[in-house]
Amino acid sequence: MSHHLDSPASRRDPRLNVTDVYAFDGDGATVLAMIVNSSLAGAGRIPGFHPEGRYEFRIHLDGAATGQLTFRFSFAPADAPGAQLVSVDRLAGTQAGDDRAAGTRVADGRTGEGFSGSGLRAWCGAAIDPFYLDLHHLAHVLEGLQNEQPIDNGEWAPAQAASTFAGSQICAIVLEIPHGDAELRPGRPIGVWAAAKLATDAGGWRQINRAGIPMMWPLFRALGGDDDSAEYQRDTTAGPDGDPANDTERVAAFVAAAVRRTGVSDPDGYGRAVAARLLPDVLPYRVGTTAAFSFAGFNGRALADNAPEVMYGLVTNSAVPTGLVAASAAETRQDKFPYVVPA
């Protein structure tokens, strides 16, 4: 859960909290995965997906600033056993960002079961969270960064690391788009982010939150401390196209402060370079290639990638071991569809 509970609305209903987004190559297809509704939200959590919500994969093509392709998932209320009917609509061109557009229905199914349509394959349901991180270590990292001090792990040591998310459950939306798709052909650069929206009383839709690059919200968005501020809500409810103008100065200054004490020759320049890499908050991926979310570069994100360690290293320009490796959470993923492990 690299995103955490970032907005008041998503804290009230974690079904609308997008915690992670993944993009990687599957069996002759591009795989997109969106994670919501962590069991770590605690008592009162309602299982499944919000029947008055929408869950969207937003895709930017060829480096475009705005999305030109959307896959929208909608869910019916749960039946007695707890399953929900699912519909998937495809919206392209100007419709991709239009909440009023209906798009084209491409698949219908049921949670907990794989389903297909129009060459696509999808799975939605409860699964084991593939994300791994020791939140005790994150607390030490954030304390050091926010106080502009070296990271002091205290009594914590990498050898003692244990994932806080081990055994926790989430709800996953997994979509396979074949390489033969006219828009997502191999070799094409794309950018991916996900959004959760809720119907309004006025008949429209309100974006509750969004996610793209992992760890952005705990490391950067929450720095102000006031998640009810106008700026914070702007980042939550708007798309990422405004991120460079809105957040570059703040992110660059934060990173520059983090590396200034490590001897980087040009802290301000490094901060600007990192901000340019992170903003807009859209996960880049080249279709048909092996995904790797790494310090050297972002190319999608595989379920096994150690995103926190990469982001810590990028922000500090130094190695910050989390004590966990991909094998630490091997039981939470599989090499075949639906790639997550159903719970």
Segments from the language model and where they lie:
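Surface-exposed extracytoplasmic segments
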Residues: 1-343
